[in-house]
Amino acid sequence: MSFLLALDQGTSSSRSIVFDIEGRPVAMAQRELRQIYPQPGWVEHDPIEIRDSQLATAREAIARAGISAHDIRAVGITNQRETTLLWNRRTGAPLHNAIVWQDRRTEPICAALRERGAEALVRQRTGLLIDPYFSGTKLQWLLDHVPGAREQAARGELAFGTVDAWLVWQLTGGRVHATDVTNASRTLLFDVHANRWDDELLSLLDVPHELLPAVFPSSHLYGETDAGLLGAALPIAGIAGDQQSALFGQACFKPGLAKNTYGTGCFLLMHNGDRFQSSANGLVTTAAAQTGPQPQFAIEGSVFVGGAVVQWLRDGLRAIDSASAVQALAQSVPDSGGVVFVPAFTGLGAPYWKPDARGAIVGLSRGTTLGHIARAALESIAYQSAALLAAMGRDAQACGGAAVTELRVDGGACVNDLLMQFQADLLGVPVVRPQVIETTARGAAFLAGLSTGVYRGLDELEALWQPERTFHPTLPPGRASELMAQWEHAVRQTVAS
């Protein structure tokens, strides 16, 4: 039999999953990743730990599958996006810890760029906002703060990459310095229309072109792993940032198809085909996974606190002993009893973009119980996601684009039936949970399988995607609108306070 290996390098852990060619997981291995917090608002990872943990899980997954490396047709890589690394081309040694996407140290750089009036240029070329979230200002910070970095960069001695490029470099023994369009599109340095690094943006951020990796489609033969690393020289044949990989793994290949990943945060992406559309409603435009030369786009919105609100119920409020207990507690009451929970622990993301907002629970009464608060906490995940989809709908309506007719879901919290039903009720469209919810890793495997001939085309992949359960809306539309109005009122109170 033939198999595909997906390397899934995430923020909290490195994972590897072996898939059969039907897209079914055969074996998985996972190792947690140490989080480094040098100062408040700073988040880093050790690049060597990223590499070693990823290699260890790959070897473990192959062993657990009971197969030889020679049975693997191709390797796909998916990764935490925006996290920024800088290393020496000759030695492969990192100059500094990786600066993680959550890191906010470059806000002064971003503020200066906004003051210079650069927002319109950045938005038009990249589809993004000027924000510390993205890689470009992190790279500028490294060049300016690591002793000797600018001088080494000027001599062509350094390489920049997001996590995928770092892994490709390490897996190929430094022979390949490359990334894919989805990861490049998250840097603030990449023209998503022309599919190339942009000289004007590089100049704006004072980044030398010599640092940059080559950029290829997501489904592409990047190179081969060193034979000694995994037991055979395996083709690295697919790369995509985690959210675009999940969109691909959900078989969202056509305009209007959308997925929401319910993790620590929530990431909602809608495929937009070959149409670049700049959002007027607080969303960003990003490159979708690309299987050929033609640019493909997605509209994206991110929620900062999704499943993390359940962690807070467990660790902060101590209302539950385990995250899995939240559904039973929430179902101990018929509804939230008028309680609305706005979990703005770290501000509000899209479509509000209120970084200074802080969490609030409104509508408390003498009759409020922990059950009501737990239910309101779960519902907050659905409310925030519904606000994103409403913003996407307004953008689509403004340009005559396709409206979302169903939402495909994945991520750890998608197994919560109460949450998924409430999500469908708010949206007024079916919410579909697939049989295989490891869609991020599956997307990377699919991309690798396409470029190596395991799959003939997107139609074949579409047929492999199968629903496990569909949640149909049960609320009258008027009631859903009333609930969303209550949510928006609570958000306004939170922001005003």
From Swiss-Prot:
PROSITE patterns: FGGY_KINASES_1, FGGY_KINASES_2. PANTHER family: GLYCEROL KINASE, SUGAR KINASE. It catalyses: glycerol + ATP = sn-glycerol 3-phosphate + ADP + H(+). NCBIfam families: glycerol_kin, PRK00047.1. Gene3D superfamilies: 3.30.420.40. GO terms for cellular component: cytosol. One of its GO terms (molecular function) is glycerol kinase activity. ATP binds at T11, S12, S13, T264, G307, Q311, G412. Belongs to the FGGY kinase family. InterPro entries: ATPase_NBD, Carb_kinase_FGGY, Carb_kinase_FGGY_CS, FGGY_C, FGGY_N, Glycerol_kin. The lineage of its organism: Bacteria, Pseudomonadati, Pseudomonadota, Betaproteobacteria, Burkholderiales. Inhibited by fructose 1,6-bisphosphate (FBP). Key enzyme in the regulation of glycerol uptake and metabolism. Catalyzes the phosphorylation of glycerol to yield sn-glycerol 3-phosphate. HAMAP family: Glycerol_kin. Glycerol binds at R81, E82, Y133, D242, Q243. Pfam families: FGGY_C, FGGY_N. Keywords: ATP-binding, Glycerol metabolism, Kinase, Nucleotide-binding, Transferase. It is an enzyme of class 2 (transferase). Sn-glycerol 3-phosphate binds at T11, R81, E82, Y133, D242. This is Glycerol kinase. ADP binds at T11, R15, T264, G307, G412, N416. SUPFAM superfamilies: Actin-like ATPase domain. Its EC number is 2.7.1.30. GO terms for biological process: glycerol catabolic process; glycerol metabolic process; glycerol-3-phosphate metabolic process. Pathway: Polyol metabolism; glycerol degradation via glycerol kinase pathway; sn-glycerol 3-phosphate from glycerol: step 1/1.
